Amino acid sequence: MDTASISSTSSNSKSSKEQIKYTFTDFDNDIKNEINELYSYSELSILKKSNISNQFYHDLHEYTSKNKWRDLTDIEKIDYLQHLIGFFELSMKGQDNYNRYLLKSRFIWYIAQGVRDETHDRKDQLHQSKLNCILLREINALPIILKTLVLSSQISNETLRNQQQQQQQQQQQQQQQQQQQQQQNENEGSGEGGTNFTTTTTTTTTTTTANTFISHGKRNNIIKNNSGSVSGVIKNINSNGTLSSSMKVNVKRADLLMSILLDIIYLIIINNKDDELFKEEIFESLEGCNNNNNNNNNYNNNILGKNNNNGTNCDNPNLISIILQLLSEFNEIDGNLYPIKKILMVLWKSLTIFMGGLEDLDRLKQERLDNVGYKKGTPKTRSYDISNFIKSTQRYHSQLKSNSVLHKVNTHYLGTPKEYKDVDVFRLPLSLSDSLSVLQTNLYPPEKVRKEIGINYYSFNNNDTITPHTQSDYFYNTSNISSSKKQIKPRILIDNPSNFERFYCMNVSNFSKIVIILLKILLAATPVVKNYTGPINLIAEIVIDQSSPGSSASLVETMQSAIDFLRHKEIISKSTLGILLLIIKHSKFNQHLQFEYLSKIMYESNALVLLYKCLNHESVEKYLFSQNYLNSEEYFNEESLPSSSAASPPPPPIFQPLNCSGSSINSISSGGAGCEGGGANPPPVQLFENYKNLFSTITSLKLIQKVMKHHPSRISSLSASKSANILKKYCSINHPMIRLYSLKVIKNLVPYQTKKWKQINMRIISDIYLEVPIHINDNWLFSHNSAINNNNNNSNNNNNNNNNNSTNNDNGLTDEHEVTLQEKVEEYHRVNYEQWYTNDGLDMCYKNDHSMGIGIFDDLLNSLQLTTEEKQAIENDRLAYIDKDEGSSLIFMNDALEDELLFNKWNIQKPKF
């Protein structure tokens, strides 16, 4: 190896260890990136070919006799916008006015994006876009656009049904013609064979052409669902750079009118997000926007009988309810052409603005702690930890009963007859007394915070203390409340509900359906799943334009479509995971039982298996630094910049691979030449962080931690060794949040690991000690069975068979905890929500059923779930995992079979709502 290669190797190894410069947030600091994600390359190509600017200026001159938008006064601008929106207020009786609606909506979109032809740089265009979107909001254009969006979805579904009926009729006619032709051939004599041969040949040719059309219409096999595999669009590329005749091109494109309307809605949302009054406008009902679609009776049935101040009356739906309705139709109506990426982006952005983003949530948490005088740096010690620490001492013994699970510390302390309440403990050293005083005054959580967020998260308190009832913990210890006390209002009738509480009231009976649909979309969008053939159609927005007769798509168009589709899936994954994390975090802040309900839905829907599957990449660095984009095809590309703004140099590269181990797509998308000439030292390719994949990775780790934390049954339902091997890859990534949450999840898995695993992975255990906050009495390093045996010895000294019954006792405690939690969740919903709805036959369900595919012990081949042998080994306490290689990881060998099983479990065609 020469000197140049050695120096290159050292520089690359040094650069790969540099910290990834990425800040985790749900709002992009640069609004240009959010707008770029909204448009696919194929959509931008269609908009360029449609010549919108010339048509817009022609229409503007006819109506205002002026040639530029900036020449208009504010009154003239409002008049022209009302003129365009006036077309949307007309009755849409069919497909006759579709082109006119599409043209006028494109004019409004052209104005909303800043009238690009009249701007000189990006900053000016973004400023004009904000002014125009504020103007659209002032003339109340958003409700009218939403009504048009609902009508366009109905037209799209009606057109789809008509096409299916026509295809069925054509198929029946062809079958009848074939039967008649066969009968004629049988009845005619042999002397007329020549004429019959000619007729038969003509009929056969016609039938072949018709059958080809029908196969596209029925979308058999891969094209049946316009599935999300790149191989569905790109197949068998010849050496000449053209597609072979066997390639199947998806001729179905997402509805253009719905796409352009969602673009306008998204631009209005992001340009008015700083206005506090806009939050209420998002949740305001639309008068006269009644949807008569029979496929969404769940929303129409959730009507409050006595309270409408929360915005839950779905006779007049709002922006969020309409988008959720489109999301439901996308899953239920087979073969629809909804632009699902835009639907998810609008839903995520509207929820973030209405409920508050992650930064707003952190600010609200800090305000809540400041109001009760709780400092963030206070030691988070619980009374349960202190009592266990005292009982674990060998010299002094507790005077409490052995079956006491949780008690206060003001009992007989350290064997002395004195209770410490407001005075020091008798005959104790001053240092120990001061330490106990600090622990007593800084218990976690404080009493004032308990009143606001509920009592201890997992409280099985057997003492006589009564937790005060507030609006946040209404049902706690209901048996201890005397009938003379004033009855507290249920949460659905409180005077000033939070925005998340209003959203929760509106969708309380549909959360199970919403979560499962999002998980199905996430499964279709994750890059780990190869050759996806499920029911979710993600490729309708990425379509190669039909070429002229006698020619085919070029190699450049084919590769552009492939990169566009990979980028498309990354954006969908980011939006889907962002919605799930936002709902989970707000539910935990609002009311803890709402969080338990949503996390239980995710767990019972096999979300843990899916999230681990999303993290199981062969090369994590390749995934985090993938370059699935074409800078020249972005909406805000470098070519549109003037020379003055493009003079700044690009940021330095973070990772520079020595060889072309990546795919040709990455080489083309990053602008490099790739492996040219097969040289030994090809030029390095500059790769930067993929912020979309970084966000998806951190969000997946956060969701795993929130779903399984403090739930031993959920942790033990998956193979701890296989899960840890996947997470070990992310511990080596030099990003603080990725390391922190991967170590947090591994910390939950350590008690279920073997001694050999702990010996091999001492580096990870040391990192957990250094980086993960640990409670004073957290015995996370103990084996799970050993900890259970110690508890059994403390609770019952006469039991001689603790080792044989440890697992059974653990299962009993776990089942009791899950059952108790489920009972509290059901009681909470019954008292606070269910009895205040006018049901009209509606069965409000607050738990998933096994018919929806939530069995955690159903076998999935070669997955994270426990096999029958592993379950038997755990029951006999003889399980031993063998790690041949420290860097080994789980590889899903049969993705198609596992996905098929997941789809069978996620059959929600007839949900129980």
From Swiss-Prot:
This is Striatin-interacting protein homolog. PANTHER family: AT25231P, PROTEIN REQUIRED FOR HYPHAL ANASTOMOSIS HAM-2. The lineage of its organism: Eukaryota, Amoebozoa, Evosea, Eumycetozoa, Dictyostelia. InterPro entries: Far11/STRP, Far11/STRP_C, Far11/STRP_N. GO terms for biological process: cytoskeleton organization. Residues 177-204, 791-814 are annotated as: Disordered. Belongs to the STRIP family. Coiled coil: none annotated. Residues 177-188, 195-204, 791-811 have a biased composition (Low complexity). It comes from the Eukaryota. SMART domains: DUF3402, N1221. It comes from Dictyostelium discoideum.
